[in-house]
């Protein structure tokens, strides 16, 4: 049995068993297509005719890296963009989601950023996101109705339920507690 592997970083492993050997299955770590081909040579007693059979099977395996959406780490703030924001919010389901809408040039945004990071470590049942309201994400910022930075949007069940504008840490904590307890 011949085994041909084509490598590609977007395809990831499968277990392959070579029936020609008695070895255990092995793990092929990176591949896009696996082709198995086997030749069977049979001889009949009458006339010693030979039969050649060739069979090819192509198997494609999708990587969980390609099919999975953006990931969020508990206890960390995840930076999102216009393409990743809604998939993460949808995946959060009924969890509370807090979005920090900031810009890199905003002084109050820089002041509250480390405190926001601490909140993500305190509230492990809440998803903490941040969105840089630059030109690339302008459409999402407009969709979410941003007027000033920083603005914190608190979402539950894919809907904005609270908003805190400005670097008002105590107001943000109170809003998060209110939404979590509802």
UniProtKB/Swiss-Prot annotation:
Residues 70-181 form the Thioredoxin domain. InterPro entries: Thioredoxin-like_sf, Thioredoxin_CS, Thioredoxin_domain. It comes from the Eukaryota. Residues 1-69 form a transit peptide. The record marks 100 as: Deprotonates C-terminal active site Cys. Disulfide bonds join 106-109. The record marks 107-108 as: Contributes to redox potential value. This is Thioredoxin F-type, chloroplastic. It comes from Pisum sativum (Garden pea).
């Amino acid at each position: 049995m011949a085994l041909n592997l084509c490598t590609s970083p977007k395809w990831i492993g499968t277990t392959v068993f070579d029936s020609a050997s008695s070895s255990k299955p092995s793990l092929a770590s990176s591949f896009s297509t696996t082709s198995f081909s086997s030749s069977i040579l049979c001889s009949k007693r009458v006339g010693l005719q030979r039969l050649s059979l060739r069979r090819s099977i192509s198997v494609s395996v999708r990587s969980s890296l390609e099919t999975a959406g953006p990931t969020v780490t508990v206890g960390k703030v995840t930076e999102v963009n216009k393409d990743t924001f809604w998939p993460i919010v949808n995946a959060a389901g009924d969890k509370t989601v807090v979005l920090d809408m900031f810009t890199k040039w905003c002084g109050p945004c820089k002041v509250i950023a480390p405190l926001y990071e601490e909140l993500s470590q305190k509230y492990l049942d809440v998803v903490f996101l941040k969105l840089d309201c630059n030109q690339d994400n302008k459409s999402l910022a407009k969709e979410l109705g941003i007027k000033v930075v920083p603005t914190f949007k608190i979402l539950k069940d894919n809907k904005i339920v609270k908003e805190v504008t400005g670097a008002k840490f105590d107001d943000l904590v109170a809003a998060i507690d209110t939404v979590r307890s509802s």
